[in-house]
Amino acid sequence: MLLAVVFCSSRAQAQENVSIGPLVGLSIANFRGDVANTDWKPGLTIGGFYNYSSESGFGFSGQLLFTQLGAQINNKTNEINLNYIQAPLLATFFFGRYGDRVRPKIFLGPNLNFLVGARDKNGNNINGDSNNRVYAPFDLGLTFGGGLNYRLQEKIWLNFDVRYGVGLLDVTRLDNSKIRNNNWGINVGLSFPLGTYNKHTGRLRTR
């Protein structure tokens, strides 16, 4: 009986999966708040991710992304392109059984955004000089969405998701207005096995 319990426990731990991979997607962004004559602007998302999933269905995804946000302005005659390094930290729940070929999922978590550039449609800098910045260097957001993981072959998964990100902070340093980021994202990634995480020892056993 004791051996059976130990065997089942070891088997469950062995099935807890850690994977990494690249991600690419489309960002569709706009502003909300004290703004007028803005419209949705497409942009690029590219980066990588770290996934952890367990038999219970709960998991975690940490991502490091380059994402283009902003908006079209002046009746679509110009653009504000805000380029961010993003770090979404997403609690994930997978539906279905562990090992199923298709695993639908939902996720929610904070998004740390670090501004690396602000340019107009022609590529001109619109963020002022180092002593007079127009846009804030950091934005905190909330990201939630859903999607599915599809197993292409043993332990190699196609990751697909649709997400919505809402900015929580004013992205400008202007005193007379408050503007926040607002964006949809459609992303595709490919995950490869990294190893097995043992929740009792807190160690990652790589392949």
Name these PLM-found stretches.
Residues 18-24, 60-62, 87, 104-110, ...:
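Transmembrane beta-strands of outer-membrane beta-barrel proteins
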Residues 13-51, 191-193, 205-207:
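Short glycine/proline- and aromatic-enriched beta-strand/turn motifs that initiate or cap beta-hairpins
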Residues 12-18, 56-57, 96-103, 152-156, ...:
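Short loop/turn motifs that connect adjacent beta-strands in outer-membrane beta-barrel proteins
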